[in-house]
């Protein structure tokens, strides 16, 4: 999809549903594209920062993707006026206590309106297939810290948390999450 097609689609959705929030999560774009989507009627944009540590970011992404550009995107979104969502996977490959401290410092600086945090889940078709899954317990603990740090943020209890622990989403709510996103797709097409 081109930026122009997305802009046109957002404009049509806004015209048909003027009272609904329109949330986009379509990755890194130019400031001009973000502005066009916003002007067409988009309200929210989700773009996980993934890590605020440059060396860690380099281990998770191809060389063409940079932490500097990811940060530029997030600050552009905030400056334009979006309700902005950031976040990271907990227990991601190469993540350390120091990288998590950098993440929390970044969240304190950005002050996003939404924070998406869920446990890392390895997939067999990725370079990270041999890494262990993140911990539900650590994820819940860190979610509670985000709730204390950003008391008004939208904080989802993620599907990944429910995948690791059958009561993960309920525990997420008890840890400070205030958004639940159930998967309503039929099992045959998930």
For each predicted feature, which ranges?
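Conserved mixed alpha/beta catalytic, RNA-binding, or beta-rich assembly cores of soluble enzyme
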Residues: 83, 88, 98-99, 154
């Amino acid at each position: 999809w081109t930026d122009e097609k997305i802009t046109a689609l957002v404009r049509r959705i806004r015209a048909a549903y003027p009272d609904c929030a329109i949330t986009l999560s379509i990755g890194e774009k130019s400031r001009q594209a973000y502005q066009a989507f916003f002007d067409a009627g988009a309200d929210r944009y989700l773009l996980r920062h993934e890590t605020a540590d440059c060396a860690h970011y380099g281990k998770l992404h191809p060389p063409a993707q940079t932490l500097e550009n990811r940060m530029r995107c997030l600050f552009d979104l905030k400056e334009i006026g979006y309700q902005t969502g950031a976040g990271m996977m907990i227990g991601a490959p190469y993540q350390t206590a120091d990288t998590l401290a950098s993440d929390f410092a970044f969240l304190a600086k950005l002050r996003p309106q939404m924070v998406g945090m869920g446990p890392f889940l390895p997939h067999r078709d990725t370079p990270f297939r041999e890494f262990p899954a993140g911990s539900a317990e650590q994820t819940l603990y860190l979610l509670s810290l985000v709730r204390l740090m950003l008391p008004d943020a939208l904080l989802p209890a993620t599907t990944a948390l429910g995948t690791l622990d059958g009561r993960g989403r309920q525990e997420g709510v008890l840890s400070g999450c205030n958004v639940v996103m159930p998967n309503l797709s039929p099992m045959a097409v998930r």
